[in-house]
């Protein structure tokens, strides 16, 4: 059943959503209520579901919709939102740039990590829109990114990090402007970003035109 659940989650599209959601719900229920299923196996299922739903940036909106229903339907999924937050918290604090000509294998792995960070970020965006994640939590992540950006701009050889941080800030602010504009501190963050955009590239050690 766990293999079927993973397979069906990977097949989710707008066209298959209505049909597959019922199949997924039934299989999840069978696993969670099954005889002989250990707590460890149940937790592994929840972790796998979160991993698959949050790592597909092309289906973020659909996946957030499904996850929202799982939280409502199954008690064991209710606290799993903390796993989503933990995953994103870790991704936010582990941004680095790797040059392809220095270490190509690590460069490829880092690109995958960067893509995953943006995918989880977009998943978080749609969870906020569904009121599963708090505005304050997401705004705190934006503040973390902005602080990291402010620090990195003035350091040597940080252009890769600056670009990655900037892309993540844009992803959150662009998609959540309406939801966040009344949060305390929003205007101050926008002012800071506006200030960054007026900096002269050549005067900053790691500032880029992006």
Residue ranges and their predicted role:
Residues 1-210:
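Alpha-helical interaction scaffolds
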């Amino acid at each position: 059943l766990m293999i079927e659940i993973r397979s069906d989650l990977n097949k989710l599209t707008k066209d298959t959503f209505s049909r597959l959601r019922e199949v997924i719900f039934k299989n999840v229920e069978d696993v969670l209520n099954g005889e002989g299923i250990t707590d460890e196996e149940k937790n592994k299922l929840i972790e796998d579901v979160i991993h698959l739903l949050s790592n597909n940036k092309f289906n973020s909106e659909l996946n957030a919709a499904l996850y929202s229903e799982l939280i409502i339907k199954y008690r064991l999924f209710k606290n799993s939102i903390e796993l989503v937050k933990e995953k994103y918290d870790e991704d936010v604090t582990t941004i680095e740039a790797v040059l392809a000509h220095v270490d190509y294998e690590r460069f490829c792995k880092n690109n995958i990590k960067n893509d995953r960070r943006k995918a989880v970020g977009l998943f978080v965006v749609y969870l906020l829109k569904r009121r599963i994640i708090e505005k304050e939590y997401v705004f705190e992540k934006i503040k973390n990114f902005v602080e990291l950006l402010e620090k990195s701009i003035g350091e040597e050889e940080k252009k890769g990090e600056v670009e990655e941080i900037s892309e993540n800030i844009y992803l959150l602010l662009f998609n959540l402007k309406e939801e966040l504009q009344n949060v305390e501190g929003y205007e101050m963050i926008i002012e800071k970003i506006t200030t960054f955009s007026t900096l002269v590239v050549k005067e900053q050690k790691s500032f880029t035109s992006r």
